[in-house]
């Protein structure tokens, strides 16, 4: 008999959502990026546009940690340069981005047993870890250079507690996350990265699915996902739903995560 994996329900929901996304043609308009198409990079992107289908067709099994990959001939939403994203327009009226503030860092903080800061996490680090001795950008660089390296920083370790998190989810060979995702043959060098990235992306997908369900029966829909961010194709007469979407998205199993909301025509 086949035993259902612990994360079966979540993967089922993710496939439902990504299949629906793949059925929605993108509205591609090259006018906003015409000035970029003269470069070699721009010409290559234009050739890609002619070759691929204008849909976001994800592969949920494409990476060991659960990050989405793209199926062949999918629109390259995950890998295209940010400057070219302006060619993607909403089919309704607005593209709304819901983006977690420093999602992986917040996940690590939660796994270490700490409460979520309500404000920007890098500002919070400046005050609570670095005693206001550096700028936000300096704190961000210092934190991320420490996060996935062997560098020591007692102040960061005190709150983020990498060793505790690694030892809780990794047995020296295998990782099992809170979401029931299992990764085998993981060495110490990759263990923390896999734990944090995998837990974060499964949490993001779970929150995105809640927004997806919230929009059922509406004109607005989940247009696509880019790593830790969800993009909504929003109808103007449903714009009041943004408040509920934001409230739904930010309430994670690890506490309320700060979310940045932005909206535009592309």
What are these regions, as identified by a protein language model?
Residues 1-266:
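Conserved catalytic core of nucleotide polymerization and phosphodiester-bond processing enzymes
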